[in-house]
Amino acid sequence: MENGYTYEDYKNTAEWLLSHTKHRPQVAIICGSGLGGLTDKLTQAQIFDYGEIPNFPRSTVPGHAGRLVFGFLNGRACVMMQGRFHMYEGYPLWKVTFPVRVFHLLGVDTLVVTNAAGGLNPKFEVGDIMLIRDHINLPGFSGQNPLRGPNDERFGDRFPAMSDAYDRTMRQRALSTWKQMGEQRELQEGTYVMVAGPSFETVAECRVLQKLGADAVGMSTVPEVIVARHCGLRVFGFSLITNKVIMDYESLEKANHEEVLAAGKQAAQKLEQFVSILMASIPLPDKAS
């Protein structure tokens, strides 16, 4: 079975949410590992546990609270996922990406993705923020794509383009906003590569990924972006560099999830402030003009 959900399942979940909240979000934000604190910045917040939302999967990873939060961020109507779903939790990609299609049916036109990632680019330091310019869908090389199976034209075309997956205008606005913030470290920009996980990468794998042109590596984000672009959503996103990958066989260091969460905690406030400021740069929907 390529997709266990029908169009009616997505629609029923969207209608349930619309009937349980007065919020009508324009922007959806997916909070990565340790980045759920962004929800604290929402005003008029309304919270739903994933468990109470029809058809919603459950989040099982430390650092992912498993809550959907509606509210306003810097004046912009938002819905935030405080915890995402991953392949390594045993979820098929159609389940990992379920919320994105629901957001589309809620009227969302922009998706912001954030994640914790390992730095492959030797210029990156722990705590850096990388603006995602492009991605490499490594699981896709072996047939793992969230759009696999029959296409539903009500969501989008059979063969969506991915050459412009990350909105160019929003990337330019992010770069100029960062300069205005006067941060000491420059905003990095690069390519994110997704691996399936949950095991961290070997030294040999890190070397291969670097040769492929990847700047940061993680275990999420790409499936949601593919489905969002299929639905016609504007997408932009950021990786918080929480560790530098191990490229040396002589190194005694080991990657671990606790380290990722700790590094994320230190740098998360900077990313949260940045995303909040950027909300004002997102074009208003046509119907509001």
Swiss-Prot record:
Predominant location category:
cytoplasm
Reaction equation(s) it catalyzes? inosine + phosphate = alpha-D-ribose 1-phosphate + hypoxanthine; guanosine + phosphate = alpha-D-ribose 1-phosphate + guanine; 2'-deoxyguanosine + phosphate = 2-deoxy-alpha-D-ribose 1-phosphate + guanine; 2'-deoxyinosine + phosphate = 2-deoxy-alpha-D-ribose 1-phosphate + hypoxanthine
Residues in coiled coil: none
GO cellular component labels? cytoplasm; cytosol; extracellular exosome; extracellular region; ficolin-1-rich granule lumen; secretory granule lumen
One Pfam family this sequence matches? PNP_UDP_1
Instruction: Give the pathway annotation.
Output: Purine metabolism; purine nucleoside salvage
**If you read the UniProt record, what top EC class would you report for this enzyme, in one word?**
transferase
Keyword Phosphoprotein in record: yes
- For this protein, what is the EC number? 2.4.2.1
Instruction: List Phosphoserine occurrences by residue.
Output: S251
Activity regulation, free text: Inhibited by 5'-deaza-1'-aza-2c-deoxy-1'-(9-methylene)-Immucilin-G (DADMe-ImmG).
Residues the UniProt record annotates as site (Important for substrate specificity) = N243
Question: Which residues are listed for a purine D-ribonucleoside binding in this entry?
Answer: Y88, E201, M219, N243, H257
One biological process term in Gene Ontology: allantoin metabolic process
Task: Name the family.
Answer: Belongs to the PNP/MTAP phosphorylase family.
Q: Which PANTHER family match?
A: METHYLTHIOADENOSINE/PURINE NUCLEOSIDE PHOSPHORYLASE, PURINE NUCLEOSIDE PHOSPHORYLASE
Q: Which disease is it linked to?
A: Purine nucleoside phosphorylase deficiency: A disorder that interrupts both the catabolism of inosine into hypoxanthine and guanosine into guanine, and leads to the accumulation of guanosine, inosine, and their deoxified by-products. The main clinical presentation is recurrent infections due to severe T-cell immunodeficiency. Some patients also have neurologic impairment.
What is the stated purpose of this protein? Catalyzes the phosphorolytic breakdown of the N-glycosidic bond in the beta-(deoxy)ribonucleoside molecules, with the formation of the corresponding free purine bases and pentose-1-phosphate. Preferentially acts on 6-oxopurine nucleosides including inosine and guanosine.
Designated name of the protein: Purine nucleoside phosphorylase
Gene for this protein?
Answer: PNP
